[in-house]
UniProtKB/Swiss-Prot annotation:
<feature type="region of interest" description="Urease gamma">
    <location>
        <begin position="1"/>
        <end position="102"/>
    </location>
</feature>
<dbReference type="InterPro" id="IPR002026">
    <property type="entry name" value="Urease_gamma/gamma-beta_su"/>
</dbReference>
<dbReference type="GO" id="GO:0016151">
    <property type="term" value="F:nickel cation binding"/>
</dbReference>
<dbReference type="InterPro" id="IPR036461">
    <property type="entry name" value="Urease_betasu_sf"/>
</dbReference>
<dbReference type="GO" id="GO:0043419">
    <property type="term" value="P:urea catabolic process"/>
</dbReference>
<dbReference type="InterPro" id="IPR036463">
    <property type="entry name" value="Urease_gamma_sf"/>
</dbReference>
<comment type="similarity">
    <text>In the N-terminal section; belongs to the urease gamma subunit family.</text>
</comment>
<dbReference type="InterPro" id="IPR050069">
    <property type="entry name" value="Urease_subunit"/>
</dbReference>
<comment type="pathway">
    <text>Nitrogen metabolism; urea degradation; CO(2) and NH(3) from urea (urease route): step 1/1.</text>
</comment>
<comment type="similarity">
    <text>In the C-terminal section; belongs to the urease beta subunit family.</text>
</comment>
<dbReference type="InterPro" id="IPR002019">
    <property type="entry name" value="Urease_beta-like"/>
</dbReference>
<keyword id="KW-0378">Hydrolase</keyword>
<feature type="region of interest" description="Urease beta">
    <location>
        <begin position="103"/>
        <end position="234"/>
    </location>
</feature>
<dbReference type="InterPro" id="IPR008223">
    <property type="entry name" value="Urease_gamma-beta_su"/>
</dbReference>
<dbReference type="Pfam" id="PF00699">
    <property type="entry name" value="Urease_beta"/>
</dbReference>
<dbReference type="GO" id="GO:0009039">
    <property type="term" value="F:urease activity"/>
</dbReference>
<keyword id="KW-0963">Cytoplasm</keyword>
Length: 234
């Protein structure tokens, strides 16, 4: 007997469904995989019998399990179950929405419950204002955690004040500078141990006082705007 990969998958699903059915009969609460397998195996078997339509099985699939049949939180995890079942007139997709009613369980796995109040970003961090102008002919976008000292060299501003700092904006957001545009931004200190690597390779070390001197020298050598570093540009 030779089986295609799809037939093997269906056979494994049938085994899993039968095992789940046996555990349910013993009063064992089903986990996510077992619940999906039980519903899927039942739908495939009924479709093969050919006595029920897709609509019938979509409705029937919602009656196989109750909240008490599954582990806490499982009902919230199964939003829908889709099964490609073989009917006498061909393969059809049977989609069962909300196959297990949540019942009285109010907590869902991974759910985040937020307070109904505003959140202060970067609370307690001192911010400095910096006027920045884009002298280039293309837009420049700077992300929230980019070391602002090392941004595009066509952005003109006091780079010394930006050393060891990033934009005071929400994580994952950015500020866009259009060509010729000048705007004021707020910067805060980069958190953590302040070891800054990568970006434009102007620091690549601890962002301390000695590192600042070296970074300013590198920035001047690489023409990152007008920089007064007190160093010789050789």
């Amino acid at each position: 007997m030779k089986l295609t990969p799809k037939e093997l998958d269906k056979l494994m699903l049938h085994y899993a469904g039968e095992l789940a059915k046996q555990r349910k009969a013993k009063g064992i609460k089903l986990n996510y995989t077992e619940a999906v397998a039980l519903i899927s195996a039942h739908v495939m078997e009924e479709a093969r019998a050919g006595k029920k339509s897709v609509a019938d099985l979509m409705q029937e699939g919602r009656t196989l399990l109750k909240a008490d049949d599954v582990m806490p939180g499982v009902a919230h995890m199964i939003h829908e179950v889709g099964i490609e079942a073989g009917f006498p007139d061909g393969t059809k997709l049977v989609t069962i929405h909300t196959p297990v009613e949540a019942g009285s369980d109010k907590l869902a796995p991974g759910e985040v419950i937020l307070k109904n109040e505003d959140i202060t970003l970067n609370a307690g961090k001192h911010a400095v204002q910096l006027k920045v102008k884009n002298k280039g002919d293309r837009p420049v976008q700077v992300g929230s955690h980019f070391h602002f000292f090392e941004v595009n060299k066509l952005l003109d501003f006091d780079r010394e004040k930006a050393y060891g700092k990033r934009l005071d904006i929400a994580s994952g957001t950015a500020v866009r500078f259009e060509p010729g545009e000048e705007k004021t931004v707020e910067l805060i200190d980069i958190g953590g141990n302040k070891r800054i690597y990568g970006f434009n390779a102007l620091v690549d070390r601890q962002a301390d006082h000695d590192g600042k001197k070296l970074a300013l020298k590198r920035a001047k050598e690489k023409h990152f705007g007008t920089i007064n570093c007190g160093c010789d540009n050789k």
